[in-house]
Amino acid sequence: MIPLQHGLILAAILFVLGLTGLIIRRNLLFMLIGLEVMINAAALAFVVVGSYWGQPDGQVMFILAISLAAAEASIGLALLLQLYRRRQNLNIDTVSEMRG
């Protein structure tokens, strides 16, 4: 069994990597990928803590997080596809120009 601290440190590192990708990147696709990494890091933390306590609640939260991430990814990718068709670019700066 993996110690609680190791699992939580791994989840924290993944969360920080996703947050860094979300903040630094200007491409919306990479921002969406960073958000997915953050969601998976939080889900990993739920699984690790649930395993440590011997409760299935962490796995239930993981299933919920994965289903929400799938819905978020499908809607986000559909919006990105429409944006790319209109602007031929996925840069975040072009989205702010769409206001009018």
Curated annotation (Swiss-Prot):
Membrane spanning stretches: 4-24, 29-49, 60-80
GO cellular component: NADH dehydrogenase complex; plasma membrane
Family matches, as InterPro entries: NADH_UbQ_OxRdtase_chain4L/K, NUOK/Mnh_C1-like
EC numbers on record: 7.1.1.-
Predominant location: membrane
Molecular function as annotated in GO: NADH:ubiquinone reductase (non-electrogenic) activity; quinone binding
Gene3D superfamilies: 1.10.287.3510
UniProt KW keywords: Cell inner membrane, Cell membrane, Membrane, NAD, Quinone, Translocase, Transmembrane, Transmembrane helix, Transport, Ubiquinone
Record field: catalytic activity: a quinone + NADH + 5 H(+)(in) = a quinol + NAD(+) + 4 H(+)(out)
GO biological processes: ATP synthesis coupled electron transport
Compartments where found: Cell inner membrane
Leading EC class: translocase
Membrane topology: Multi-pass membrane protein
Source species, domain of life: Bacteria
Family the entry assigns: Belongs to the complex I subunit 4L family.
Record function comment: NDH-1 shuttles electrons from NADH, via FMN and iron-sulfur (Fe-S) centers, to quinones in the respiratory chain. The immediate electron acceptor for the enzyme in this species is believed to be ubiquinone. Couples the redox reaction to proton translocation (for every two electrons transferred, four hydrogen ions are translocated across the cytoplasmic membrane), and thus conserves the redox energy in a proton gradient.
Subunit structure comment from the entry: NDH-1 is composed of 13 different subunits. Subunits NuoA, H, J, K, L, M, N constitute the membrane sector of the complex.
Protein name listed in UniProt: NADH-quinone oxidoreductase subunit K
Gene name in the database record: nuoK
